[in-house]
Amino acid sequence: MIHRTNYQQLRIGLASPEQIRSWAERELPNGDVIGQVDQPYTLHYKTHKPERDGLFCERIFGPTKSGVCACGNCRSVNDEGESSRFCKHCGVEFTDSRVRRYRMGYIKLACPVTHVWFLKRIPSYIANLLAKPLKELESLVYCDLFLARPVAERPALLRLRGLFNYEDRAWRNILPTFFSTQNYEMLRKNEIVTGGDAIREGLASLDLQSFLNCAYLEWQASVKQKPVGIEWEDRTIRRRKDLLIRRIKLAKDFLRTNMKPEWMVLYFIPVLPPELRPIVELHEGELITSDLNELYRKIIYRNNTLREFLSGSEFTPEGLIVCQKRLVQEAVDALIGSGIRGQPMRDIHNRPYKSFSEVIEGKEGRFRENLLGKRVDYSGRSVIVVGPSLSLHQCGLPREMAIELFQAFVIRNLIGRHLACNLRAAKCMIRKGNPIIWEVLREVMRGHPVLLNRAPTLHRLGIQAFQPLLIEGRAIRLHPLVRGGFNADFDGDQMAVHVPLSVEAQIEARLLMFSHLNLLSPATGDPVSVPSQDMLLGLYALTIESRQGIYRNRHLGFIDRVNVYSTKLLHFSSYCDLLRAKESRQVDSHSLLWLRWKIDLQIISSKIRELSSESHYESSGTSFHFYENCRIRKCRDGSISSMYVLTTAGRILFNQQLKEAMQGVSKNSFSYTTSSTLSTSTIDRCNTNSNNEE
């Protein structure tokens, strides 16, 4: 059994035939070696007890009842002594029945078969290593083609090379007349091969280091090769480069992990523990079983038939043996990955079997459903909605969820402040909703961050830390700018809330995981907290002029750009005057106005350096220069004495909010702008300026 205290990580890789066998094989005190499943039976049709050496054998997988053997004898599980722990008649161990959840068996195949994951998946690892087309390899695996293999340092009688079709050869019916059956079989085994044997020999003959060196040299030569200008030739060169890169990566992985390519061909099939593929008895006495049991039975039936054919090969036609090898390969394919690039195997009711791949893959598979998707304490889940009034590092938690998540902390606080005498009294106060509870909860939440996670967690920004705030309702509220990191939308998406318990977890959340510290993508460095959708529309509506867009048709008395200087517009000397006028409803967000601008600030517009459209000079030497968006008053010496910009109240409010939100950035980065959106380039510039200041 795997104990979580002994193992800190899990690595998935290829297993050698000896390792697969060692998973299940063990020796009894009487010297018998058990573990091999060689009978296709499951339960006896009358007694419903496991059959010996079958798929539910108690000798191999353990007793169905704790301390009870197949004979019905009972003995304590804690009895000491090797001989007393086994029944001498049936060989069943007197142990806990829970061992049937992790004890495995194995099926010894009469012929090697190719693992369908490494053959038919895209990209095909076997095809990449052998540098052969996938269709040819599939024909070889399923015994449609044969491969010539002359014995080393011996002359080849048939003079065959490469792949060929056995049925098309004329000598197939001539040679048996000149050789005895035994000699002809020996000749055939030395000269030709098909099925998993051919794939295993090809993979075993690879020298990975020399293979890697040759592939690397060829890739270097192809990189130096220039395009010839012909489309199909250039495409062929690119495909060859991609193939070489895949082969180099694959060879490096095999060398790094000390795994052998021939392990992709199976000699032993591991049999899952019975509790993971159960047979359930219904009330009427009927039995329902897992599809894996039926697939295992097919493999054992076909494998036993092939073993009988091979044991009497002198009298068995060659075509029958080849056909049976193909059936064994198809049965193993159906068990591991039914329907990969083909039709799945079906039962008598035309229902496709559920293979091992379908059991472990997908959202409802073994990994995501049972291992990664476990329910954990101090967590909750709810729908997310937008919270525009929140700060970037804040989230709104419903009161009902927050009191459940922080109940232990609230109880400790109540008892520590002598507001409750014991645990029962504190829980009673929480259940009744005493008003003091919410004050204590706010105090607890003030110093405790929470983690928000949206599945699937594809990158680091899929889980971030926030400062929780109590809100009404039953939905979690988020600042609209943080949705980019989660790849979430406010259209019904759900997010999980986790409470970090240890001090180390809380420190990590505050220093590394807070949302305002994760504004850039860790993969590309691009900003992820950028306005989109309704935020862009709101910024557009805030910064639009009364003579533009939808307001052009709504307000008939709009001002033309030509007579803007001849029209009487409101003048304001500061932002505070404008704010007071806005609060008293003297101006709206879209009305044009003149605002006195500080001379030491720069306008983010190059038009101030252009020629003025009109200039007025006074006898005192002062001059007025009129531009498209501003007017400047200069002294006699040419210095600027005052400057007014043409803008709207909405733009000024947006610009001021932008400056206050980015106080740590250089003031030059946030001068007045007429842009209606906070673009990604603005955030890039702000980030660059802040880095320069640091």
Swiss-Prot record:
Keywords: Chloroplast, DNA-directed RNA polymerase, Magnesium, Metal-binding, Nucleotidyltransferase, Plastid, Transcription, Transferase, Zinc
Record-listed Zn(2+) binding positions: 69, 71, 87, 90
InterPro entries membership: DNA-dir_RpoC_beta_prime (IPR045867), RNA_pol_asu (IPR000722), RNA_pol_N (IPR006592), RNA_pol_Rpb1_1 (IPR007080), RNA_pol_Rpb1_3 (IPR007066), RNA_pol_Rpb1_3_sf (IPR042102), RNA_pol_Rpb1_clamp_domain (IPR044893), RNApol_RpoC1 (IPR034678)
UniProt binding sites for Mg(2+): 489, 491, 493
Keyword DNA-binding carried by entry: no
Origin: domain of life: Eukaryota
GO molecular function per UniProt: DNA binding; DNA-directed RNA polymerase activity; magnesium ion binding; zinc ion binding
Cofactor note: Binds 1 Mg(2+) ion per subunit. Binds 1 Zn(2+) ion per subunit.
Cofactor annotation: Mg(2+); Zn(2+)
Signal peptide: none
Key word Glycosyltransferase present: no
Compartments (UniProt record): Plastid, Chloroplast
GO cellular component: chloroplast; DNA-directed RNA polymerase complex; mitochondrion
E.C. no: 2.7.7.6
One record GO biological process: DNA-templated transcription
Reactions this protein catalyses: RNA(n) + a ribonucleoside 5'-triphosphate = RNA(n+1) + diphosphate
Family stated for the protein in its record: Belongs to the RNA polymerase beta' chain family. RpoC1 subfamily.
Self-association and partners: In plastids the minimal PEP RNA polymerase catalytic core is composed of four subunits: alpha, beta, beta', and beta''. When a (nuclear-encoded) sigma factor is associated with the core the holoenzyme is formed, which can initiate transcription.
Function (record text): DNA-dependent RNA polymerase catalyzes the transcription of DNA into RNA using the four ribonucleoside triphosphates as substrates.
Descriptive protein name: DNA-directed RNA polymerase subunit beta'
Origin species: Adiantum capillus-veneris
